[in-house]
Curated annotation (Swiss-Prot):
Function (record text): RNA-binding protein that binds specific mRNAs including the ASH1 mRNA, coding for a repressor of the HO endonuclease. Part of the mRNA localization machinery that restricts accumulation of certain proteins to the bud and in the daughter cell. Required for the delivery of cortical endoplasmic reticulum into the emerging bud.
Positions in coiled-coil regions: 82-234
Family: Belongs to the SHE3 family.
Gene name tied to this protein: SHE3
Superkingdom: Eukaryota
Chief site of localization: endoplasmic reticulum
Positions of region (Disordered): 48-70, 327-378, 430-470
One Pfam family per UniProt: SHE3
Species for this entry: Eremothecium gossypii (strain ATCC 10895 / CBS 109.51 / FGSC 9923 / NRRL Y-1056) (Yeast)
Annotated protein name in UniProt: SWI5-dependent HO expression protein 3
């Protein structure tokens, strides 16, 4: 068995050496010296001898074993097997030696081929470099030839253009000479005509001088008649202007008296508004609204309830009503305890008249579904296309409509406006309370400072209802 294992090991080494040789043959670019194959062959033969020696010695030493008689039959059979294996090993060894020689020869050929290939590569690189140089020279020569061709074409074109221009100028020169001869003949003819025209013009000048003198005398007469007519017309216009100025003075007096009555009504309405606001305790309602809003949000938070989005938009910290309350808080309170009214100065007769239409009413006659829906929440609702007017003290359930009140009308201590004022009347005012506006001069408009306000009837009626309910 030991001999069999040794033979198998030697065969495996030979196979490995054969595989190495095949690998070297399969990859011609790998360079390996031939001495390495010889060294491997020597190790292979030494392994065979070492493995075979102990087997034979064991057999020889086995003659002193007690079981020598029983193993004679096995020795004769295994000897034949060993001889066959030795023959196979010798055949494989000779085959391996032949393959080693062939591989050495192929390696020598491969080295020669690699050397020739390196020389060929050097030759190819030098030829490529030379080819590139020749191509660059050829390209330069080709570009030079193209440039010369283009220059030749341009020169031919320039020569043709110069020839055509020369012929054209020659033709024009001949035409100029012929035209000059014609012009000389026309000049002589025109000179004769000019002399005739000068003589006719002298005679016309004398004739028209006489007509101009006659027209000048007629114009002087017309000027005198026109001055007389203008004087009479200006006298009539002056009388008409005096009548108009007198009518304007009467009208301004009536307007001043009507304005005073309107201011008294406005002051009384403002005082009623302030008293009703104080009676309703608007600030207390605001505090109560905030407390109820906080309680509602705390209740929803503790019970883990989700409030509607519309409720948060209306009653949240940044909601619609919170913004309106902030605007109401920022607006300064006004007082109607005193009023400064200066009498209007009488306009001069020379002032110009302007007719101004009375301002329109702000309360709509028809109620749309949006205004009906906003009767509980106030003036406007989020999402409705209605202009928002700042109001003071807006409460849920109380509708506040916008009013036009100038700041100097409620607080005389803040200063009076010098701009032309706009008068606005309430809906339930009498027809005589609507003032008629006329244009004043700059001095009269600077002295006339009047505060004005309007309180819509709907707001006063609703405030009265809230006061009665309270």
């Amino acid at each position: 068995m030991a001999a069999t294992n040794a033979v198998e090991a030697g065969y495996g080494g030979a196979a490995e050496n054969g595989g190495c040789a095949e690998g070297l043959l399969g990859s011609p670019m790998r360079f390996s010296p031939s001495s390495k194959l010889k060294v491997n062959h020597g190790h292979f033969m030494a392994n065979i001898n070492n493995n075979a020696g102990p087997g034979k010695g064991g057999t020889a030493a086995g003659g002193t074993s007690p079981t020598r008689e029983a193993s004679y039959a096995n020795v004769s059979g295994s000897g034949k097997v060993i001889e066959n294996l030795h023959q196979q090993v010798d055949a494989l060894t000779s085959t391996n030696l032949q393959l080693t020689k062939q591989s050495n020869q192929l390696l020598e050929k491969l080295e020669g081929c690699n050397a020739r290939e390196a020389k060929y590569l050097e030759t190819i690189s030098s030829l490529k470099h030379e080819n590139e140089n020749l191509n660059s020279m050829l390209n330069r020569k080709t570009r030079r030839v193209k440039d010369l061709d283009m220059e030749l074409v341009q020169l031919r074109t320039s020569h043709e253009e110069a020839t055509a221009s020369h012929n054209q100028l020659k033709y024009q020169l001949e035409n100029k000479f012929a035209h000059e001869t014609e012009l000389e003949q026309q000049c002589q003819l025109l000179q004769a005509q000019y002399d005739a025209v000068v003589d006719a013009q002298r005679r016309y000048r004398e004739h028209y001088q006489k007509e101009i003198e006659e027209l000048r005398e007629a114009l002087e007469a017309l000027k005198k008649d026109n001055d007389k007519f203008l004087g009479e017309h200006m006298a009539r216009l002056t009388r008409s202007q005096l009548d108009i100025d007198k009518s304007m003075s009467d009208y301004n007096g009536k307007f001043h008296r009507m304005e005073l009555s309107q201011k008294e009504a406005v002051i009384e309405l403002n005082e009623k508004y302030d008293r009703m606001r104080a009676d309703l305790d608007v600030d207390g309602w605001i505090v109560l609204y905030k407390q109820m809003r906080d309680i509602a949000f705390d209740y929803a938070k503790q019970l883990d309830l989700s409030l509607p989005k519309e409720f948060a938009e209306l009653h949240g910290e940044d909601g619609y009503y919170a913004k309106m309350l902030d605007e109401d808080r920022q607006s300064s309170p006004v007082s109607t305890s005193s009023t400064a009214v200066e009498p209007m100065s009488q306009p001069s007769p020379s002032m110009s008249a302007q007719t101004l239409s009375p301002p329109p009413l702000r309360v709509p006659k028809n109620r749309t579904p949006i205004t009906k829906r906003s009767s509980f929440y106030g003036n406007t609702m989020p999402g409705a296309n209605i202009s928002l007017t700042s109001a003071t003290g807006l409460l849920p359930g109380v509708k506040r409509t916008g009013s036009i009140r100038s700041f100097h009308g409620r607080a005389p201590s803040e200063g009076l406006s010098d701009t032309p004022t706009i008068f606005t009347a309430s809906r339930n005012a009498s027809p005589m309370e609507f003032p008629q506006r006329s244009a004043l001069t700059s001095a009269a408009s600077a002295n006339a400072t009047v505060r004005h306000s309007s309180v819509p009837r709907h707001r006063r009626n609703q405030s009265s209802q809230v006061g009665n309910n309270k």
